[in-house]
C-alpha cells in the first residue's frame, strides 16, 4: 500500500491531528457523551475490551506502547507525517481522550506527553515561550547535549577536587539550571499531570541543582555529596541502543514488579528478626572469664570487686593465634571454656565491631538479612551455635530455606518473566518493522509499475533488493540467462584469489585437497591440538632447563604444523574459498599471531603475544560437538550478553561514583578507627577502589565492606550497600539467567550433533585400511556398515530406556522376563526342554523369586534394613572405640547385612534375570554394593584394614528407595535426567577455565611467595626486597596456599574465585605480586584486578548459571510428564488441563451452623465478623511491635512495662479464645491457626502462674516467645487484598511440597557425605575452619558443617584443614595412634564433588521449582483461573448449599451465576447463557457443582479468546455414587419448547372444536 494512498491519509488524519485551542475545552464535554454509552456497552467492555488496555477486572489503564518516553509502534511510525514532528498533537492514547493532555512526537518517533493546563499558572500550550521550551526539550540534540554533559561531569567526579574542578562545577551547574528552566517552562512545575516534579527522575535533578546553589553560600558538609546522585542520569544513555533499551526496560519492569515480593520479604525478615531477637538477645556477648582468685590477690569477694575483676579484658580467655575473644556456651554441644574459666554473658562488645548481634531489633533485622543473602553467614552461624548449642541449627535451616531458597528465587522468577515479556515485545516490534518494510517494497514496486516504469526486482542475500532496468536485464540474460554478469571487483577478486591457472596446478590442488580435507587429516589435527593444549598446561613454576626446552621445542613444532596446515588448505581451496569458512579464518589468525610471537620472541615487553597461544585451545571446538554447540549458541546470543554486561558495568560505574562521593573522605579522615590504623584494601578513596568494592557487593559480598564503611561513617552505608546488592546481585545477575533461558535452550536440552562422530569413524576406517596393507592377518577385522539414522536413534533410545528403567518397570509384569540376553541363547542353543523337570523347577524358582521381589512388604523390609544400616554407619564416629558394646553390634550387623544383601541380590537375579538386572542402574548399584561387602568381608578376615571403607558404599543404596517415595519421583528423575547435561557443562566449564588457568600460570606462577617472620606476618619490601635478603635475615620465604604455580593449583584457585570463598586473599596476592623471587608490594600490580573481573564474568556468572538453565528446563519436562501432560500440548491446553484438575479435586465445604442459644449466637456473630478479625490483626501487630522493642540491657522499669503490656495482650487473646470457642464450639479446632492460638493462650497463662516451675522443669520462656511469634503468621491471611502477594503466596503454597522433597534429597546427600566425612576426616588436626565444634568427629557435627558447605560457605577453610599433609602428625600403628593428617587428593575429590552436587545442582533445583510454579500461577491468573477464583466460587456455592450436599436446585442456578464475581460471573439476564453452557441436570432437578464449575471454566476461556475444543482435553470422570445426570440445560429448554408447542397445538385444537 502506497504512502499516499487514501487509506493511509485517512488513518493519518484520524491519529495525528494538530493540537488546537478548541481542544483545550473539548475534553470537558466528552465525559457526558461517553457516559451515555456506558450501560449500552457494559457487557462488551467486559468481554471484548481493549486487551492490553484493560485490567483483569475490566478497569482501563494507559496503553503501555504509547506511554510517556516510549517510541511509536512500528505501524504508527511508518505513517507518521514528518511535517508534524516536534509539533503538539492531540493525544492518540484512548485512555487520555477525556483528559487535558497533548503529545509531541519527534522524528525518531519518541513520545512526549504534556498537560494542557497552564504552566506556572500563566503559560498555556500556545504561549510562544512555552512552545519554544517544548520544541527545545524534545529535540534529540538537547538530550544528547545533557547526556554528554552528565558523562563529562562523571569523569570529573572521578578526579580529585582542585580549583579547576570547582570552576567546572559552576559550569555544569549553569547547564543543569538551564535544563531545569526549560523543562519547567515546558511541563509546568508540580500541580498538573506530567509536570516537572511528577517525574521521579526530575526530583533528583532539582534537589541536586538546589543543593548546588545553597553550597555556594552555606557549607552543607556531607550533604553536598548528594550531587553524586546526578550520575544516575547517565542511566538514560541506554536509550541510544535498542538492545540496551530492552535490557533496561526489563530491569525497570523487574524492579517495579518486585514491590509485592519485597513486602513479603520484609514481612518474613521482620518475623525472623523478632524470633532471633527473642532467642539470641545477648548470647553473642558470652565469653570465658577466669575464676575469681581465691588467693586474696584481689581481696575478699564482693560484688564490686567481682564486677571490676570480670570487666577486665585481661581475665578473658583468648587463644594465642586468635584476634577476637572466642564465644562460649553453657548448653550441651556449645563451645566449652578451658579449666579455670566460666562462661558468662554481657562482657565485651559483640563481634565484628559490634555490628553482629541480636541485641536490638535493628541489628537482628540486619543479621537476618545477612543470613538470607548468605553473605559471610557462616561466621554468624558458627558464633550462634558455639554460644547457644547445636540444636539452634533449626533456626538457621528455617531462615535459609524460606528466605534464601524460596523468596530470593521468587526474585529470579519475576526477573525472568519481565525479561521474557520485554524480549517478546521487542521481537514483535522487529517483526512488525520487517513486515512494514516488505509492504513498503511491494507498494513501491506496484507504484512504479503503475507509472509505466517496467522494472524487475532481484533479491540479494535475502535482505536488500536491487532494481534493474529491463534493458540491462535483457542484455545480461544474453550472456547468462540466470545470473548477472560479475562486476570488475568480483572479476579482480576471482583473478587474485581463485587459483585455477593451469591443469597441473589444479591437479596439485586436488592432491593436496584429498589430504587436508580427509577425515584422517582432521583427526590428526585434533590430536595435535590436544597435545598442544597438554604442552601449554604443563608450564609451571621452577621448571628445569631441560623441561623448559622441551616445551619451547614443542611450541615450535606445533606452530610449524599449524602454518603448514594453513598453507596447504589455502593451496587446496584457494584464498577465496578458504576464508569463507569462519573456522579457517580463526585458524589463520592463530597462525599470524604465532608467527608474530616467534618473530618478536626476544624483544623485551612484547611477550603479550605469548598469551595469544591460548586461542589455540578454542580450535578443539571444531572437533568437539558439545563445545562447538556451546560456542555457536554463545556467538548467536553475543549481542544480548553484551547488552547485559553494558548495563551491569554502567550500574557499577554509577554506584562507584556515588560511593566515592558519599564515603570517600570518611576513610581518610577516620583511618585511625581501623584495628591496625591502616587503610583497608576495600575502600572508597578513589574510583578504582570504589569500583572494585561495588563489584564485590554485586558478587554477593557486601556485609564486611559495609562494616568498614560504618566504622568510619554512619548508618547511611546500610541503604547504599543493600541497594547495590539488590539491584546488582538479585536483579542484574538474574537477568543473565533469564538471557540464558531465552537463548540457551538448545544447548541445555538438545542432543549434540553427531557429524564429527561420523568423521571420526571415517578416520578410524582409514587407519584400519592402512594397517591392512601392512598386516594381511587383520582381514578378520570387519567394520560394521553404517546404520541408517533411524536405526541409530531407535537403538540409542532403547539403551537409554534400559539405563533409566526403574525396578518397578522391570517388575511390572506378571511373569519374570527372559533370564539372559538373546546372544546367550544363540550361543547355547542346547537347553533343557520346556516340559522337563529341570526346566519346570527352574521356572518355579524364578516364579517364587519374582513374586517375592514384587511383594510390597518385602520391598519395605529391604528399605527398613537400608535405613537401619545407614543409621548404624552414622553411629560410627570418633567415640566408637570407647563403646565396646556398639563396636560388637556393628561388627555382627556387618556380617548379617553381608549375608542379607547377598541373598537379596540372588533373589533379584532370579526374579528379573541377568539381562534386566545388568541393564538397570539401580540393580548395578546393588551389585556394586554387594561386591564391596564381600570384598570388605574377605579383607576383614585377612586382617587388611586399608580397604575396609568399601562397606560405606552401602549408604548409596539410600537413593534407590528415595525414588519410590511419593512425590519424590519428579525430583529424582530431574536429577537423573540432568546428569548427562550437567556433565557436558562441567566439561565445557573445565575447558573454558583451562584458558584462564594457563593465563594465570603465565601471569602469576612463582609470584605469590613472600617473606614472613616467626608470627607469619608479611614483612615490608623495605625490610627484605627479595628472596635472598629474606633467607639472609633468617626469615621464612613461603608460598601462599592458593597459587598459580601450575595448572592444578590454578584450577583450585579459580574455583575459590568462582565461588567467592577465599578469593580476596588470592586477588590480594595477585595485585601485590612483582617478579619471581621478589617481595610483594601492596597494590603495585593493581590492574591485575581485570584478570579476575573477566574470569568472574565469563567463568562464574556465565558458566555456572548454565546449571540453573538446565535444571529449570528439565524439571519443567519431568513435571509435565508426571502430571500426564504432553510436551506437544499448546499453552492453552496446559492451562485448561490444570483448571480441570482443580475443578475435579475441589469440593464444597459445609458452613458452620449458627447456635440457637442467644449468648452463643452473639459470640458466633462476633467470631465471624470481619471487623473483629481486623481488630485482632491490629492487636497482633501491636503485640509483635512490643516484642520488637525488647532489647538487651534494658532497664528494670522498661522490663516491667513490657511485662504489663504482655499481660494485657494475654488477657485480650484469652478473651478472644473464649469468644471463639463459645461461638464456634468444636468447629473452632478445625482451623490450624485456632489450635496455635489456643495452645499459646494455655501456655502463656501457665507461664504466668508457674513461671519458675515451667522454666526449670517443663518449658523455657524462650519457647513461649516462639509460640507467640507464630501468631504473626495469621497476618498472611490479610494479604488477600493485594493480588500480587496472593499470587506469590499461592505459588509458594503449591511449590512447598516439592521444595520439601528437594530438601529431603539434600539431606540424604548430606547424610552420605557425613558418613564418608567421618570415615576420612574425623581425626584431622584442628586448623582453618575445623575446630572443637565444627568438625567431622560425630555425625551431628558433620551435618552441621555440611549444611554450611551446601551453600559453599567457608569451604576454603575446610579444605585447608582436610588437605593439611605437612603441619600434622603421621599415624603410629604400634601405639594405635590414627594420626591427624589430611589428604590433599581426598580433600579435593570430597569437597569439589560435594560442591557440584549441592551448590550447583540441588540448590539450583529450588530455583527450578520456584520458577516453574510462579510461571504457572501467573499464566493461570492471566489466561486461566486462580485459586482465589475457586475459593470465591465455593464461598458463593456455600450460600446456596449450606449443608455441602454438592447439589443445588436448577431454579437457583441463575442466582448463583449472578452472585459470583468476575471472571466467573454471568450477569442477568443469563437465561440463554445457561442454555449455551449445556450443564447436566441430575434427578430431582439438581445441579452438580463440578458440572457448573467446568462449564464456567470453559466459558472463561472462551471469553478470553482461548476457546478449548471439545476433543482437546478430556475431563476426568466423576465417580460420585449419587451422580446420575438425566438431562441438561439445553435439553431441558428443548423439552420445554416442545411442551409449549404441544400445549399451543392442543389449545388451538380445543378452540377449533
Swiss-Prot record:
Pfam families: GPHH (PF16905), Ion_trans (PF00520). SUPFAM superfamilies: Voltage-gated potassium channels (SSF81324). Residues 1-140, 187-200, 242-260, 414-519, 570-583, 624-639, 741-857, 908-921, 965-981, 1109-1171, 1220-1231, 1280-1298, 1411-1553 are cytoplasmic. It is found in: Cell membrane. Glycans are attached at residues 300, 308, 312, 330, 683, 1015, 1028, 1034. Disulfide bonds join 288-337, 328-343, 709-717, 1011-1030, 1368-1381. GO terms for biological process: membrane depolarization during action potential; neuronal action potential. Saxitoxin binds at residues 378, 704, 1063, 1356. Tetrodotoxin binds at residues 701, 704, 1062, 1354, 1356. GO terms for molecular function: voltage-gated monoatomic cation channel activity; voltage-gated sodium channel activity. Residues 1-68 are annotated as: Disordered. Residues 1133-1146 are annotated as: Linker region that may regulate channel inactivation. Keywords: Cell membrane, Disulfide bond, Glycoprotein, Ion channel, Ion transport, Membrane, Repeat, Sodium, Sodium channel, Sodium transport, Transmembrane, Transmembrane helix, Transport, Voltage-gated channel. The record marks 539, 542-543, 549, 613, 1002, 1027, 1032 as: Interacts with the spider Mu-diguetoxin-Dc1a. The keyword Ion transport applies. The chain crosses the membrane at residues 141-159, 166-186, 201-218, 225-241, 261-280, 393-413, 520-538, 550-569, 584-603, 606-623, 640-658, 720-740, 858-875, 889-907, 922-940, 946-964, 982-1001, 1087-1108, 1172-1189, 1201-1219, 1232-1249, 1263-1279, 1299-1316, 1388-1410. Belongs to the sodium channel (TC 1.A.1.10) family. This is Sodium channel protein PaFPC1.
Amino acid at each position: 500500500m502506497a504512502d499516499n494512498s487514501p487509506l493511509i491519509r485517512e488513518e493519518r488524519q484520524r491519529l495525528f491531528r494538530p493540537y488546537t485551542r478548541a481542544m483545550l475545552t473539548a475534553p470537558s464535554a466528552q465525559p457526558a457523551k461517553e457516559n451515555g454509552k456506558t450501560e449500552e456497552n457494559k457487557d462488551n467492555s467486559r468481554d471484548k475490551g481493549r486487551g492490553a488496555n484493560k485490567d483483569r477486572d475490566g478497569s482501563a489503564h494507559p496503553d503501555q506502547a504509547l506511554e510517556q518516553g516510549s517510541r511509536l509502534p512500528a505501524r504508527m511510525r511508518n505513517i507518521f507525517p514528518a511535517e508534524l514532528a516536534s509539533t503538539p498533537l492531540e493525544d492518540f492514547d484512548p485512555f487520555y481522550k477525556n483528559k487535558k493532555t497533548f503529545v509531541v512526537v519527534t522524528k525518531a518517533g519518541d513520545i512526549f506527553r504534556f498537560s494542557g493546563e497552564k504552566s506556572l499558572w500563566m503559560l498555556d500550550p500556545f504561549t510562544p515561550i512555552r512552545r519554544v521550551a517544548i520544541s527545545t526539550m524534545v529535540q534529540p540534540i538537547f538530550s544528547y547535549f545533557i547526556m554528554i554533559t552528565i558523562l563529562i561531569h562523571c569523569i570529573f567526579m572521578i578526579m580529585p577536587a582542585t580549583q579547576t574542578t570547582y570552576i567546572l562545577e559552576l559550569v555544569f551547574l549553569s547547564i543543569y539550571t538551564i535544563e531545569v528552566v526549560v523543562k519547567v517552562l515546558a511541563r509546568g512545575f508540580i500541580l498538573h499531570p506530567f509536570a516537572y516534579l511528577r517525574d521521579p527522575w526530575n526530583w533528583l535533578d532539582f534537589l541536586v541543582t538546589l543543593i548546588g546553589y545553597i553550597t555556594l553560600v552555606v557549607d552543607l558538609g556531607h550533604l553536598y555529596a548528594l550531587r553524586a546522585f546526578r550520575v544516575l542520569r547517565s542511566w538514560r544513555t541506554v536509550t541510544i541502543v535498542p538492545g540496551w533499551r530492552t535490557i533496561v526496560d526489563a530491569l525497570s519492569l523487574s524492579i517495579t514488579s518486585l514491590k509485592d515480593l519485597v513486602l513479603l520479604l520484609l514481612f518474613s525478615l521482620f518475623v525472623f528478626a523478632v524470633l532471633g531477637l527473642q532467642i539470641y538477645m545477648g548470647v553473642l556477648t558470652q565469653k570465658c572469664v577466669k575464676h575469681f582468685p581465691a588467693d586474696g590477690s584481689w581481696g575478699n569477694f564482693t560484688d564490686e570487686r567481682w564486677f571490676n575483676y570480670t570487666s577486665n579484658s585481661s581475665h578473658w580467655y583468648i587463644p594465642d593465634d586468635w584476634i577476637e575473644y572466642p564465644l562460649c556456651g553453657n548448653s550441651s554441644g556449645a563451645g566449652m571454656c578451658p579449666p579455670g574459666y566460666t562462661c558468662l554473658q554481657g562482657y565485651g562488645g559483640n563481634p565484628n565491631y559490634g555490628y553482629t548481634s541480636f541485641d536490638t531489633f535493628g541489628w537482628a533485622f540486619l543479621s537476618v538479612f545477612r543470613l538470607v543473602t548468605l553473605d559471610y553467614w557462616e561466621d554468624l552461624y558458627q558464633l550462634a551455635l558455639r554460644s547457644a548449642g547445636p540444636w539452634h541449627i533449626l533456626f538457621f535451616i528455617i531462615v535459609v530455606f524460606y528466605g534464601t531458597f524460596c523468596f530470593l528465587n521468587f526474585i529470579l522468577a519475576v526477573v525472568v518473566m519481565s525479561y521474557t515479556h520485554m524480549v517478546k515485545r521487542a521481537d514483535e516490534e522487529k517483526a512488525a518493522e520487517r513486515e512494514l518494510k516488505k509492504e513498503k517494497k511491494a507498494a513501491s514496486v506496484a507504484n512504479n509499475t503503475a507509472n509505466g516504469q517496467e522494472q524487475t526486482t532481484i533479491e540479494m542475500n535475502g535482505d536488500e533488493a536491487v532494481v534493474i532496468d529491463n534493458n540491462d536485464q535483457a542484455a545480461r540474460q544474453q550472456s547468462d540467462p540466470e545470473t548477472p554478469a560479475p562486476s570488475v571487483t568480483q572479476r579482480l577478486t576471482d583473478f587474485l584469489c581463485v587459483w585455477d591457472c593451469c591443469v597441473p596446478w589444479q591437479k596439485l590442488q586436488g592432491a593436496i585437497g584429498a589430504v587436508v580435507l580427509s577425515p584422517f587429516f582432521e583427526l590428526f589435527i585434533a590430536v595435535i591440538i590436544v597435545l598442544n593444549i597438554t604442552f601449554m598446561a604443563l608450564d609451571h613454576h621452577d621448571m628445569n632447563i631441560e623441561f623448559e626446552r622441551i616445551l619451547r621445542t614443542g611450541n615450535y613444532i606445533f606452530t610449524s604444523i599449524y602454518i603448514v596446515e594453513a598453507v596447504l588448505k589455502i593451496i587446496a581451496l584457494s584464498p577465496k574459498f578458504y576464508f569463507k569458512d569462519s573456522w579457517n579464518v580463526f585458524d589463520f589468525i592463530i597462525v599470524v599471531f604465532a608467527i608474530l610471537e616467534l618473530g618478536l620472541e626476544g624483544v623485551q615487553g612484547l611477550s603479550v603475544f605469548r598469551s595469544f597461544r591460548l586461542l589455540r585451545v578454542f580450535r578443539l571446538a571444531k572437533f568437539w560437538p558439545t563445545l562447538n554447540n556451546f560456542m555457536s549458541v554463545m556467538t548467536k546470543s553475543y549481542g544480548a550478553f553484551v547488552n547485559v554486561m553494558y548495563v551491569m558495568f554502567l550500574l557499577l560505574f554509577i554506584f562507584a561514583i556515588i560511593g566515592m562521593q558519599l564515603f570517600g573522605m570518611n576513610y581518610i579522615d577516620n583511618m585511625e578507627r581501623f584495628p591496625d590504623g591502616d587503610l583497608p584494601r576495600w575502600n572508597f578513596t578513589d574510583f578504582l577502589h570504589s569500583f572494585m568494592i561495588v563489584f564485590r557487593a554485586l558478587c554477593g559480598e557486601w556485609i564486611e565492606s559495609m562494616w568498614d564503611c560504618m566504622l568510619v561513617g554512619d548508618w547511611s552505608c546500610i541503604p547504599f550497600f543493600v541497594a547495590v546488592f539488590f539491584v546488582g546481585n538479585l536483579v542484574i545477575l538474574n537477568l543473565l539467567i533469564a538471557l540464558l533461558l531465552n537463548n540457551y535452550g538448545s544447548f541445555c536440552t538438545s542432543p549434540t550433533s553427531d557429524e564429527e562422530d561420523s568423521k571420526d569413524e571415517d578416520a578410524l576406517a582409514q587407519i584400519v585400511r592402512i594397517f591392512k596393507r601392512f598386516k594381511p592377518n587383520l582381514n578378520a577385522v570387519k567394520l560394521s556398515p553404517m546404520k541408517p539414522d533411524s536405526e541409530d536413534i531407535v537403538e540409542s533410545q532403547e539403551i537409554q530406556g534400559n539405563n533409566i528403567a526403574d525396578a518397578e518397570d522391570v517388575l511390572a509384569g506378571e511373569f519374570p522376563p527372559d533370564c539372559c540376553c538373546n546372544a546367550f541363547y544363540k550361543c547355547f542353543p542346547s537347553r533343557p526342554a520346556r516340559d522337563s523337570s529341570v526346566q519346570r523347577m527352574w521356572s518355579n524358582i524364578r516364579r517364587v523369586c519374582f513374586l517375592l521381589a514384587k511383594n510390597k512388604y518385602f520391598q519395605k523390609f529391604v528399605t527398613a534394613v537400608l535405613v537401619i544400616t545407614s543409621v548404624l554407619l552414622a553411629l560410627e564416629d570418633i567415640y566408637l572405640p570407647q563403646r565396646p558394646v556398639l563396636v560388637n553390634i556393628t561388627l555382627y550387623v556387618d556380617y548379617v547385612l553381608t549375608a542379607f544383601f547377598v541373598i537379596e541380590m540372588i533373589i533379584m537375579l532370579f526374579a528379573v534375570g541377568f539381562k534386566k538386572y545388568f541393564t538397570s542402574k539401580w540393580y548395578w548399584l546393588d551389585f556394586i554394593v554387594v561386591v564391596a561387602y564381600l570384598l570388605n568381608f574377605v579383607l576383614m578376615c585377612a586382617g587388611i584394614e586399608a580397604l575396609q571403607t568399601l562397606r560405606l558404599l552401602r549408604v548409596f543404596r539410600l537413593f534407590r528407595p528415595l525414588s519410590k517415595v511419593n512425590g519424590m519421583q519428579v525430583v529424582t528423575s530431574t536429577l537423573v535426567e540432568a546428569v548427562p547435561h550437567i556433565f557436558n557443562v562441567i566439561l565445557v566449564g573445565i575447558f573454558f577455565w583451562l584458558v584462564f588457568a594457563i593465563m594465570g600460570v603465565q601471569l602469576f606462577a612463582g609470584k605469590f611467595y613472600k617473606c614472613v617472620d616467626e608470627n607469619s606476618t608479611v614483612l615490608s619490601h623495605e625490610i627484605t626486597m627479595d628472596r635472598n635478603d629474606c633467607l639472609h635475615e633468617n626469615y621464612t620465604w613461603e608460598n601462599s596456599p592458593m597459587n598459580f604455580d601450575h595448572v592444578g593449583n590454578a584450577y583450585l584457585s579459580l574455583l575459590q574465585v568462582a565461588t567467592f570463598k577465599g578469593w580476596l586473599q588470592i586477588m590480594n596476592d595477585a595485585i601485590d605480586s612483582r617478579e619471581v623471587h621478589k617481595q610483594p608490594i601492596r597494590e603495585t600490580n593493581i590492574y591485575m584486578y581485570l584478570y579476575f573481573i573477566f574470569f568472574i564474568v565469563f567463568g562464574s556468572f556465565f558458566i555456572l548459571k548454565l546449571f540453573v538453565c538446565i535444571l529449570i528446563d528439565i524439571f519443567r519436562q519431568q513435571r509435565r510428564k508426571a502430571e500426564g501432560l504432553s510436551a506437544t500440548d499448546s499453552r492453552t491446553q496446559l492451562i485448561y488441563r490444570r483448571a480441570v484438575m482443580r475443578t475435579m479435586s475441589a469440593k464444597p465445604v459445609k458452613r458452620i451452623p449458627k447456635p440457637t442459644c442467644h449468648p452463643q449466637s452473639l459470640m458466633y456473630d462476633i467470631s465471624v465478623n470481619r471487623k473483629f478479625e481486623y481488630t485482632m490483626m491490629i492487636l497482633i501487630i501491636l503485640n509483635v511491635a512490643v516484642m520488637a522493642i525488647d532489647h538487651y540491657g534494658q532497664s528494670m522499669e522498661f522490663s516491667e512495662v513490657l511485662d504489663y503490656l504482655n499481660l494485657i495482650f494475654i488477657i485480650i487473646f484469652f478473651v478472644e479464645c473464649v469468644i471463639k470457642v463459645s461461638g464456634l464450639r468444636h468447629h473452632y479446632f478445625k482451623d490450624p491457626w485456632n489450635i496455635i492460638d489456643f495452645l499459646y493462650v494455655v501456655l502463656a497463662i501457665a507461664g504466668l502462674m508457674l513461671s519458675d516451675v515451667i522454666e526449670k522443669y517443663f518449658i523455657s520462656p524462650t519457647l513461649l516467645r516462639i509460640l507467640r511469634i507464630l501468631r504473626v503468621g495469621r497476618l498472611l491471611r490479610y494479604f488477600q487484598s493485594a493480588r500480587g502477594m496472593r499470587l506469590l503466596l499461592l505459588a509458594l503454597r503449591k511449590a512447598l511440597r516439592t521444595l520439601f522433597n528437594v530438601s529431603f534429597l539434600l539431606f540424604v546427600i548430606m547424610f552420605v557425605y557425613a558418613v564418608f566425612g567421618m570415615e576420612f576426616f574425623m581425626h584431622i588436626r584442628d586448623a582453618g575452619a575445623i575446630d572443637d565444634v565444627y568438625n567431622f568427629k560425630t555425625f551431628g557435627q558433620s551435618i552441621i558443617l555440611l549444611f554450611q558447605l551446601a551453600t559453599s560457605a567457608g569451604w576454603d577453610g575446610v579444605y585447608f584443614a582436610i588437605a593439611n599433609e605437612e603441619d600434622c602428625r603421621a599415624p603410629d600403628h604400634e601405639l594405635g595412634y590414627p594420626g591427624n593428617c589430611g589428604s590433599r587428593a581426598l580433600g579435593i575429590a570430597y569437597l569439589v564433588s560435594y560442591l557440584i552436587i549441592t551448590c550447583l545442582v540441588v540448590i539450583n533445583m529450588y530455583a527450578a521449582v520456584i520458577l516453574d510454579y510462579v510461571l504457572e500461577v501467573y499464566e493461570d491468573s492471566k489466561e486461566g483461573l486462580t485459586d482465589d477464583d475457586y475459593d470465591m466460587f465455593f464461598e458463593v456455592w456455600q450460600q446456596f448449599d449450606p449443608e455441602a450436599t454438592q447439589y443445588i436446585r436448577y431454579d437457583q442456578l441463575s442466582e448463583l451465576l449472578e452472585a459470583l464475581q468476575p471472571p466467573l460471573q454471568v450477569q442477568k439476564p443469563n437465561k440463554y447463557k445457561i442454555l449455551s453452557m449445556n450443564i447436566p441436570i441430575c434427578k430431582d432437578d439438581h445441579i452438580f457443582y463440578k458440572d457448573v464449575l467446568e462449564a464456567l471454566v470453559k466459558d472463561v476461556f472462551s471469553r478470553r479468546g482461548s476457546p478449548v475444543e471439545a476433543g482437546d482435553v478430556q475431563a476426568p470422570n466423576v465417580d460420585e455414587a449419587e451422580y446420575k445426570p438425566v438431562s441438561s440445560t439445553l435439553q431441558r429448554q428443548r423439552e420445554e419448547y416442545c411442551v409449549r408447542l404441544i400445549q399451543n397445538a392442543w389449545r388451538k385444537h380445543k378452540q377449533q372444536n
